[in-house]
Swiss-Prot record:
Name listed for the protein in its UniProt record: Paraspeckle component 1
Disordered: region residues: 457-520
GO molecular function: RNA binding
Record-listed N-acetylmethionine modification sites: M1
Region Sufficient for paraspeckles localization, annotated ranges: 122-355
Length: 520
């Protein structure tokens, strides 16, 4: 984030002569030199726009934006400075004015009792410049000691895979909190060493990552190779230990009695120096042996892990295959059940259709029967035709039809007595004579019985009445009373189509049969 300090033009003094004069005057207590370092001194006036300053002044104008590297984050823990040997009466405003030439600070902390403080600048470069210029500066008779503050939220990550990069490392540890920097350490050839470090913006995320990775197994890649997370060891490999910071103790003076030298062979110094070197060589060999054993164990573990992973993949494939087969079997069962259900539904529909058809047929028959019983009355011809069809079969297949009172004779036998009547419709009881019966057909033809209905109301007294012979449906005889004569029905006569050996008899022919009755 670029703040307004990035747009601020600052002037940094780079005059070595003035710095040397300042250092020499610090020991003599020169007021001018001390005033130069006081925070209350007036700022160095900047050159007006368009005006060139002389080159011998030793100052130059810089832009703070030029001190930010591409992609560098601002106000990180790496931009934090430790300022020691502060005066006990320094205020926070005086402390800020001391660093106001290096941009706008974001964190200011002062411990007046112990005489130290912390300040965080915008970029690492500006912090390095401030450290180089202000370290050793005299402030109220005290030389300032400025160092980069220890990064308390930095972690060391070991056992990294060769395919892990800076971006992957940062992405992996971002789940614990904001990460300021993540670096995978490489050798001089650019090959990964399996180590790296991660710097968080605050301590709580670092503690969380340390606890989570210590309790569980944090994997960064497909290979089940967990990372080892430890607190980062802080080393000052830039400033080191200067002579002015050495404590002049008795041990210090004793060790400094002789200058650096080479031990002469055969002397006491050379003997023990050789023993120290042998101890170091033994340590080196043991470390190499330990490293070799660890490397072999890692290779063996990787081989076993690869074989186990292959077997695990095969097991997963088998399980997946079994699961698919089970799913196919279940789908097949569902399909069979669906087909069975459809078949049952189809059979049920067919049964219902058949039952509906039977119900319709039964209903139609009942309706027909009801209609016959209620509204249908058969005529005489239909009754006679039914009687002819339901009659007994005579010789040679002739049908012998008769009425309920005079059944027809079979063959060449004479007509049977019909309720005491003879062939000439004469009864054995006294009374008026009946008219002649129907004419005899040929042999095998239907011999119809005497009709029961009278022809008219006239009473015939003669035995053989005049007029045409009576037809089927003609009156059986004369009755008392007058009745309206009925018209003869057409088409009624002897049944034709009988077998050909029977001739057609005449109406008035005498029947000579065994059952012939005597005439009186």
């Amino acid at each position: 984030m670029m703040l307004r300090g990035n747009l601020k033009q600052v002037r940094i003094e780079k005059n070595p002569a003035r710095l040397r004069a300042l250092e020499s005057a610090a020991g003599e207590g020169d007021p001018a030199a001390l005033a130069l370092a006081l925070p209350g001194e007036p700022p160095v006036p900047a050159a007006p726009a368009g005006e060139d300053r002389p080159a011998d002044e030793g100052g130059f104008t810089i832009d703070i934006k030029s001190f930010l590297k591409p992609g560098e984050k601002t106000y990180t823990q790496r931009c934090r400075l430790f300022v020691g040997n502060l005066p006990t009466d320094i205020t926070e405003d005086d402390f800020k004015r001391l660093f106001e030439r290096y941009g706008e600070p974001s964190e200011v902390f002062i411990n007046r009792d112990r005489g130290f403080g912390f300040i965080r600048l915008e970029s690492r470069t500006l912090a390095e410049i401030a450290k180089a210029e202000l370290d050793g500066t005299i402030l109220k008779s005290r030389p300032l000691r400025i160092r980069f503050a220890t990064h308390g939220a930095a972690l060391t990550v070991k056992n990294l895979s060769p395919v892990v990069s800076n971006e992957l490392l940062e992405q992996a540890f971002s789940q614990f909190g904001p990460v300021e920097k993540a670096v995978v350490v490489v050798d001089d050839r650019g090959r990964a060493t399996g180590k790296g470090f991660v710097e968080f913006a605050a301590k709580p995320p670092a503690r969380k990552a340390l606890e989570r990775c210590g309790d569980g197994a944090f994997l960064l890649t497909t290979t089940p190779r967990p990372v080892i997370v430890e607190p980062m060891e802080q080393f000052d490999d830039e400033d080191g230990l200067p002579e002015k910071l050495m404590q002049k103790t008795q041990q210090y003076h004793k060790e400094r009695e002789q200058p650096p030298r080479f031990a002469q062979p055969g002397t006491f110094e050379f003997e023990y120096a050789s023993r120290w070197k042998a101890l170091d060589e033994m340590e080196k060999q043991q470390r190499e042996q330990v490293d070799r054993n660890i490397r072999e164990a890692k290779e063996k573990l990787e081989a076993e892990m690869e074989a186990a992973r292959h077997e695990h993949q095969l097991m997963l494939m088998r399980q997946d295959l079994m699961r698919r087969q089970e799913e196919l079997r279940r789908l097949e069962e569902l399909r069979n059940q669906e087909l069975q259900k459809r078949k049952q539904i189809q059979l049920r529909h067919e049964e219902e259709h058949r039952r509906r058809e039977e119900e319709m047929i039964r209903h139609r028959e009942q309706e027909e029967l009801r209609r016959q019983q209620e509204g249908f009355k058969p005529n005489y011809m239909e009754n006679r035709e039914q009687e002819m069809r339901m009659g007994d079969m005579g010789p040679r297949g002739a049908i012998n039809m008769g009425d309920a009172f005079s059944p027809a004779p079979a063959g060449n036998q004479g007509p049977p007595a019909m309720m005491g009547m003879n062939m000439n419709n004469r009864g054995t009881i006294p009374g008026p004579p009946m008219g002649p019966g129907p004419a005899m057909g040929p042999e095998g033809a239907a011999n119809m019985g005497t009709p029961m209905m009278p022809d008219n109301g006239a009473v015939h007294n003669d035995r053989f009445p005049q007029g045409p012979p009576s037809q089927m449906g003609s009156p059986m005889g004369s009755r008392t009373g007058s009745e309206t004569p009925q018209a003869p029905m057409s088409g009624v006569g002897p049944v034709s189509g009988g077998p050909g050996g029977f001739g057609r008899g005449s109406q008035g022919a005498n029947f000579e049969g065994p059952n012939k009755r005597r005439r009186y």
